[in-house]
């Protein structure tokens, strides 16, 4: 996996910060789940990003990197008690996913934190104009409308003083209208919450969902237009309600990191049967999205950028699963053994979604720095890593390692 450092700072400083400069309290909480590499997260930390964490290990990483207190947002679901306890210990802002977690959190840590957030799910379908973007009513996340009203009443009674609300209603949207439409839903909801419970929000978290164009020629999101759209709704809904000081938060893992990573793999096999296949030395272990979602990732054959795309291939990995294909019926230049193939836009939800099925090992991660130098920021997995959870037994003591010389 290859990452590019220059783009990471540029996208935040020159795009995201400018887009939301109208909101003094704005903060981007990078979604650690998208790309959990401490070297990359440190780059974003330099620009003032916080961390959006969803698990114990993500909290541990954020804490180890020096993120403190409200620089960490903990948004989890089906949450184990020990994760709530650690989040509270390091002062992270806890974003509750469920009404029953109010009582569960209090019993777990002995109190309700002064700063607390709740995740809202309005149900039904989420539309932009007449287009259905997603189906929140079928999602496992969040409080219902009635639950969130009651929830804030209870949290206030139990001593909470600073409140936030969060919602994620559609994934990987490529439209400048998603955040403004989501914002309108949340802004109107928090006005109602204030009127019915007396709870005034201190921050509103629009979460993620801002996507990137994966296909050449597709028009991407204009984050400045998105920021302007959110600002308009803010002034229409919140300001007249006396809530013109509410901070806006975002959690844009894919938008922040997706375009700035690629998977580099080598053609090692060609097969001519009912179709033309090119086998590469990467597989779904390194990039799961095409196999899991049927997702498109553009492929460049290095050194043949200007060659005609006059061959049709399925580009495959070696897993014992027929869906382990990076491309199906893709028009590409003639591929020879040893050619390097670059799969684009793998910087988010790429390496992070990797796994070890078939005993496959995950690749290294390399950072391409602004000066053109390369830096190893994660070594490749080894067989020793794969078998590490058996290291307290002697059942594999006679195993030979063909990689050891």
Where are these regions (language model features)?
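Acidic, glycine-rich loop-and-beta core segments that form the ion-binding/anion-interacting portion
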Residues: 180-238, 245-249
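Conserved active-site and cofactor/substrate-binding residues in soluble primary-metabolism enzymes
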Residues: 35, 100, 143-146, 150, ...
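Short, electropositive alpha-helical surface patch
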Residues: 173-189, 219-228, 263-268, 398-405
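Active-site-proximal beta-alpha core segment in soluble small-molecule metabolic enzymes
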Residues: 26-203, 212
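Single conserved hydrophobic/aromatic residue that forms the stacking wall/gate
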Residues: 1-12
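Charged (often Lys/Glu-rich) extended helix/loop segments that serve as interaction or gating elements
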Residues: 235-239, 243-405
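Generic beta-strand/beta-sheet core signal
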Residues: 31, 54, 75, 97, ...
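A short, N-terminal amphipathic alpha-helix
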Residues: 13-21
């Amino acid at each position: 996996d290859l990452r590019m450092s220059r783009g990471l700072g540029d996208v935040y400083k020159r795009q995201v910060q400018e887009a939301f400069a109208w909101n003094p309290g704005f903060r981007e909480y990078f979604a650690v789940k998208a790309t959990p590499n401490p070297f990359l997260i440190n780059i974003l930390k330099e620009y003032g990003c916080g961390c959006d964490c969803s698990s114990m290990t993500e909290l541990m990483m954020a804490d180890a990197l020096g993120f403190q207190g409200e620089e960490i947002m903990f948004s989890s679901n089906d949450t184990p008690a020990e994760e709530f306890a650690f989040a509270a210990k390091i002062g992270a802002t806890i974003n509750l996913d469920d009404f029953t977690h109010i009582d569960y959190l209090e019993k777990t840590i002995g109190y309700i934190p002064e700063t607390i957030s709740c995740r809202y799910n309005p149900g039904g379908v989420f539309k932009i104009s007449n287009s259905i973007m997603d189906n929140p009513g079928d999602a496992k996340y969040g409080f219902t409308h009635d639950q969130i009203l009651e929830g804030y009443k209870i949290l206030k009674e139990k001593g909470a003083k600073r409140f936030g609300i969060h919602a994620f209603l559609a994934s990987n949207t490529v439209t400048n209208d998603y955040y403004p439409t989501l914002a309108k839903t949340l802004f109107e909801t928090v006005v109602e919450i204030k009127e019915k419970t007396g709870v005034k929000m201190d921050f509103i978290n629009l979460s993620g969902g801002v996507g990137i164009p994966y296909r050449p020629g597709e028009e991407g999101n204009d984050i400045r237009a998105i920021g302007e759209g959110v600002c308009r709704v803010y002034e229409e809904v919140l300001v007249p309600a006396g809530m013109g000081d509410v901070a806006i938060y975002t959690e844009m893992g894919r938008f922040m990191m997706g375009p700035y990573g690629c998977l580099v793999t080598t053609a090692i096999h060609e097969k001519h049967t009912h179709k033309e296949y090119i086998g590469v030395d990467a597989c779904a272990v390194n990039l799961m999205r095409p196999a899991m979602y049927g997702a498109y990732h553009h492929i460049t054959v290095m050194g043949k950028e200007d060659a005609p795309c006059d061959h049709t291939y399925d580009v495959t990995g070696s897993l014992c699963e027929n869906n382990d294909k990076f491309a199906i019926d893709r028009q590409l230049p003639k591929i020879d053994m040893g050619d390097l193939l670059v799969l684009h836009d793998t910087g988010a939800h790429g390496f992070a979604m990797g796994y070890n099925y078939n005993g496959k090992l995950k690749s290294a991660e390399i950072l391409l720095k602004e000066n053109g130098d390369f830096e190893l920021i994660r070594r490749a997995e080894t067989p020793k890593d794969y078998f590490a959870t058996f290291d307290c037994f002697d059942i594999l003591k006679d195993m030979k390692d063909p990689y050891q010389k």
